[in-house]
Amino acid sequence: SACSHRLSLGADAYDRHVAMLTERFVVSPGPTSPAADYYRDHDRLRGWIVTLVITVIAAVTRFAMLRYPTDAGTPVFDEKHYAPQGWQVLTGGGVEDNPGYGLVVHPPVGKQLIAVGEALFGYNGWGWRFSSALAGTLLVLIVVRIVRRLARSTLVGAIAGILLIVDGVTFVSSRIGMLDIFLAFFVTAALGCLVVDRDEMRRRYATVRSEGRMAASRFGPRM
């Protein structure tokens, strides 16, 4: 037993033996202070450079020849619903002409965003697809930033962005005047806000702990 081993070695020798084993096998704790500003700022700059490069690549793939194809100058597939409705929102004082409310299930935001592109470029392929292409490009940007923050790796974030660029569903959704890409963009942006909030609360918690205010109130520390 530990007691008999302690008696056979002697108290002092046994304690030195335990201390030696502890130093050998216990993993050293992490740093108690943040990294130097130089390395933090350098990584932040590199992260934004990589993000912007990948975003530019995404923009090229989303905007190149955006007006093609069309059905003899008219919308294709379900664009035939949303492009005219966006135009109605633009030309009808923000009101969509929807007799019988056949498509009332769709919220107006997506059609309003399509209308923005039509206001800039007219009723053509560029007009009804511009907002989708912009949302698809920004989707790549926020995915790179979210994954980089979660993985704490610029490389992993870059890989996520590249995979999203070449994803077929996202590529097509970004180049057609429909509502799917707007839903994907806003849901992903909401996730990004949650991740940022998580990191902010961790930072506040670390500050409270370092200042010794954990037990300042029976309801917990004020963050």
Predicted segments, located by residue:
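Short linear segments in intrinsically disordered or otherwise low-structure-confidence regions
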Residues: 6-8
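Short hydrophobic alpha-helical segments enriched in small aliphatic residues
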Residues: 13-15
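Membrane-integral, polyisoprenol-dependent glycosyltransferases
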Residues: 10, 21-223
